[in-house]
Structures are given as structure tokens and as C-alpha cells.
Amino acid sequence: MVDTEMPFWPTNFGISSVDLSMMDDHSHSFDIKPFTTVDFSSISAPHYEDIPFTRADPMVADYKYDLKLQEYQSAIKVEPASPPYYSEKAQLYNRPHEEPSNSLMAIECRVCGDKASGFHYGVHACEGCKGFFRRTIRLKLIYDRCDLNCRIHKKSRNKCQYCRFQKCLAVGMSHNAIRFGRMPQAEKEKLLAEISSDIDQLNPESADLRALAKHLYDSYIKSFPLTKAKARAILTGKTTDKSPFVIYDMNSLMMGEDKIKFKHITPLQEQSKEVAIRIFQGCQFRSVEAVQEITEYAKNIPGFINLDLNDQVTLLKYGVHEIIYTMLASLMNKDGVLISEGQGFMTREFLKSLRKPFGDFMEPKFEFAVKFNALELDDSDLAIFIAVIILSGDRPGLLNVKPIEDIQDNLLQALELQLKLNHPESSQLFAKVLQKMTDLRQIVTEHVQLLHVIKKTETDMSLHPLLQEIYKDLY
């Protein structure tokens, strides 16, 4: 059940002013005035059991760090880069509630026009032309010259082998191109753009869905500073910026204070509080920032601000953490997670080494991230996916479900077609992505259960007031 009085969550969803005196007073009614500033410094930090830390000699520490870093450096470059930024040309949609036409949606073989089975030897090609080109190259076949410039199509492709091979070369097939594997994004966008005008002419509704996808992506870029594309560039070493500082133990954490601009973790030399608790508190403050970012994004989803105000609150209350963990996956690989806007990389093993229950918090997120990242969604996919999460009509306590479901239905159509076009080789991707929504709910449920444990065991530690309000009556 959703509480109707929410003293910490602004109804205009600015979520930007935090006043400690207001937060400590639970007697007042919900203020509908917009918050204008964020002042996290007004929230006093609780006192924890002090644990002494000592600074090692800087030169010795740097030497030891460099040696140890060699063991962890490869962790930052272990995954292929995510597909590049969104291109409007690649966002093509068909008519709602209608299976895409094979003649339009299936990418054609560049040689004969048959349905392409994949990206082979540098171009999209059917199985027949792929095999023909492979045999010709491998056996070094030489065909009788033909000067007729025969037209190569599905029914005639076997009639003139010379012209067929010349067509293979003309469209860009190359034996060396096999090493590149999947289709380059630029080539994919070019091919999709070739059928864009035909689709829009036959299905005017698709233009609306394309506009929706573009709008959501633009809002996504404005709302979330560290996108997946930027994060993957850092993790794969494909950025001109310096590599993130790797934190793998207590000593490297202390060294990191001199190299990373921590926004929410008090430096060890100033506060000797237990590391696990301070890291947990830092995660809380980052979560509060993420709630603000998600809220701003939600306000830009067409139709969201027209919903009942209480339903807007409910949708965000139940959706924000599912989105936080979706976005967190973009910052993760199997070995660790980017922190402080990509300045640092904290290893998975270090986080697991924190004392219980804090050491248990991140492991389910890593397990989810590894599987979710395997789907290879890009930022244009994620922009629609998180909108679908927000507009979930089955959240407890909703007052008017119908308009919410109508908006989500439109978003689901956009997502399904987006995935079919952006990932033509993954026919079951839409179903797999929807399954992740169920997984995310389970992760949030487990997270809330761990918070209950902390509430009982860490009696002198409190949650951020905004997060308290979100977690109230949540699962």
C-alpha cells in the first residue's frame, strides 16, 4: 500500500531541495512547492565505531600499487565496446501490433537480393552467396570472362558465375573482412536508412514511433551524464582520458583519495570510520542523485506528467531502483564497477571482502549485470527500456491504471521494433529483455531485505531520508 502523505518526495518531481529540519519532522503534510537546491551537507553524518588507519610512505605505496595493479589492470579491458551512439537513421518502425513485412524489415543480401542470413565477409549476404564467395576464394576459382554485365538476383544468381563473383567484389565482399565479425554500426545504419523512406510511406505510424524513440534518447542523454557508450569506452580503454584508478584493497582506497574526487565518501585521513559503512553511505548519496536523474527523465516521457499525481509518485517509487540497477550494469564488467563518474574502478573482490552484510549488497548486481550486458543493448535501446519499466501498470496502489497501460503499450511497440532493427541477428531479444524486468524486481526485493537486516544490526546508522520514503512499504 502506498502512503498518501510523502514528506520527502516532491509532487512536482524536482527532488532537488533537501532540508534536514524538514526531514526530521514527520508531522507536516506533503509540500507541493518545487524544491530548488540540493544541500546534502545539511544531513549530518551518523557516528560509527572508529577504526584507525595509517598512511604508508607515498613512494613505497605507489610502488606496491603499481605491482598489484598489473594483476587488476586487465579487468578494465575485458569486454567488447558497446555499440556507438544512437543514430536517428537506425530507428525504423513498422505499424503497431503488426509483424514487420519480410520485404521491408529483413535486410537483403547485397549480392542477389535474397534474405540475408547475417554479416559475411564484410557485407550482409545470404547463405548461397556466402558459400559461393567462400568456395571461389578458398579454391582460387577462375571463371570464364563475361562482358554482358549480367543482372544478379535470387533466380538468376547461378547462371553466370563470373558476373556473380564480380557483384560480390563490387558490393564490398572481402576474405579479409571475416575477421571483423559482426556488422559495423555505420554499415548497419546505412542499410537501415535505405529502407527508411519506404517504411514511412507504407506505415505513417512508424514515423511517430521513430520520433518517440528519438525524443526518449535525447531526454536520456540529457538526464544521465555517464551513458553506457561512455562507460564502455572507459572499460575497454577506448577513451583519450586517463584510465580509471583501480581500487582493490584498503591501501589502494587510501591512495585513491589523492587521485579521485570523491563526492560522497569522506577521506580516510579525515574520518577513520569503518570503510564498509562509509562506502555504503556513499552509495546512498549516489542513489539519491540517480533518483533525481530518473525523475527528470520520467517527466519527459510523453504522457507521464498527465497522469494522476499520486500515480506518478507510485510509479517512481517502485521503478527507480529497478532503473538504477539497469543503469549500474552499464558501469560494470565481471571484475568490477566504475565509480566517481568513471574516475575510479572498484573491484568486485574488494566489495565482496567488506564485512557482512555490506559485502553481500553488490554481488547480486554483478550477477545481473554480466547477464544483462550479454544482451548488448545500447543507449538507444536502454532509453526505451527504462521508460517501459517506469510505466508499469501493475504497481501496487495505482489509482488509474488504464492510461498507464496505454502509454506502456506504445513504448513496448517501440521497444520491440527497435530491438528487431538494431539487433536483427537476435530474434528472441525482445522476450529476453522483458524477462530482465522480472529479474530486476527480484533484485530490488532482495536489496530491501538486506536493508532490513542492516536496520536491525547497525542501530546507529540511518538511511537517507529520501531513500527511507522510497523503501517504505516497498515489497
Swiss-Prot record:
It is found in: Nucleus; Cytoplasm. A motif (9aaTAD) lies at residues 465-473. There is a cross-link at K222 (Glycyl lysine isopeptide (Lys-Gly) (interchain with G-Cter in ubiquitin)). Residues 208-473 form the NR LBD domain. O-GlcNAcylation at Thr-54 reduces transcriptional activity in adipocytes. Phosphorylated at basal conditions and dephosphorylated when treated with the ligand. May be dephosphorylated by PPP5C. The phosphorylated form may be inactive and dephosphorylation induces adipogenic activity. Keywords: Activator, Biological rhythms, Cytoplasm, DNA-binding, Glycoprotein, Isopeptide bond, Metal-binding, Nucleus, Phosphoprotein, Receptor, Transcription, Transcription regulation, Ubl conjugation, Zinc, Zinc-finger. A zinc finger (NR C4-type) spans 109-129, 146-168. Residues 106-180 bind DNA. Nuclear receptor that binds peroxisome proliferators such as hypolipidemic drugs and fatty acids. Once activated by a ligand, the nuclear receptor binds to DNA specific PPAR response elements (PPRE) and modulates the transcription of its target genes, such as acyl-CoA oxidase. It therefore controls the peroxisomal beta-oxidation pathway of fatty acids. Key regulator of adipocyte differentiation and glucose homeostasis. ARF6 acts as a key regulator of the tissue-specific adipocyte P2 (aP2) enhancer. The 9aaTAD motif is a transactivation domain present in a large number of yeast and animal transcription factors. Interacts with FOXO1 (acetylated form). Heterodimer with other nuclear receptors, such as RXRA. The heterodimer with the retinoic acid receptor RXRA is called adipocyte-specific transcription factor ARF6. Interacts with NCOA6 coactivator, leading to a strong increase in transcription of target genes. Interacts with coactivator PPARBP, leading to a mild increase in transcription of target genes. Interacts with NOCA7 in a ligand-inducible manner. Interacts with NCOA1 and NCOA2 LXXLL motifs. Interacts with ASXL1, ASXL2, DNTTIP2, FAM120B, MAP2K1/MEK1, NR0B2, PDPK1, PRDM16, PRMT2 and TGFB1I1. This is Peroxisome proliferator-activated receptor gamma. It comes from Cricetulus griseus. The gene is PPARG.
